[in-house]
Swiss-Prot record:
Substrate adapter for ufmylation, the covalent attachment of the ubiquitin-like modifier UFM1 to substrate proteins. Its main location: endoplasmic reticulum. Belongs to the DDRGK1 family. This is DDRGK domain-containing protein 1.
Amino acid sequence: MDGGGGMLGAVVCLLLVFAIFPLLLWRRRSDAAHRLPPQPLQDERVLRGGPAPGPAARRMRRRPLSTSADASTSRDRDVDDADSDLEEEIQDVPRGSKKKEKKRQDREAQRQAEEAARDSRRTKQDRYAEMRRKKDEEREAQERLMEEEARARKAKEEEAAALEFEKWKGAFSVDAEGTTESDTQDDGQGLLHNFVEYIKNQKCVPLEDLAAEFRMRTQDCINRIITLEGMDRLSGVMDDRGKFIYISTEEMKAVADYIRKQGRVSISHLASNSNQFIDLEPKPQYNEESNLDENAAAGTEL
């Protein structure tokens, strides 16, 4: 019986060894994974070949194994919960960092957009200022050109008027009583004065009579009147009947004042009331002076 009991104990021990060994291996792997210190082996004496425990000892041995398994499961659960919390915290940290990074990027994009808008406005203002500067320069250059052209035109007109005046002085002639060409040129200024004064005194003079008075052709007389008007020596109008009506500067001013006061005035109304502003009565001073000059000339001849 003792030999049979020993064999039975040995078989039971082997079974326990084979049953406990996987548990021990699993616990070591779990502890290694969670960095936990290894648990002491409670049944070390069984592995060392000690006496076989009895049924009560085996029951007591099973209870710690179950308790140890429960504790290991609880620890694993706690470790898993801790890992889960750690992962959530790790996930929360990047999420907050991403929000901050996104806000920073948004602020940077807004700053760049504002800077680009300012640059665009500055560029437009510079372009507008440059365009205005060029336009001002072009306008000033055009004004200078117009002034130069006006001065050149005025100088040309004055030169032409002076040349025409010199020609006109030589065109006057006197009756052939021994007067030479040099005498005519010397008396040109006096003849010009007489021509102008004759028209002013006659007020309304037929062009043919004027030409006959100064021994000129009618067309030459018309040209001379136009020249004198350009020189501001005479002012007036030529009608379609071949008459020149002299109108002084004061009379023209009176007509302009009348038109300004009346507003719109028809030509017929102005013509009917022209005698209020323009004196058309001839003045005899020139005739008397002419007679005196003729008498003096006749006395000289005698």
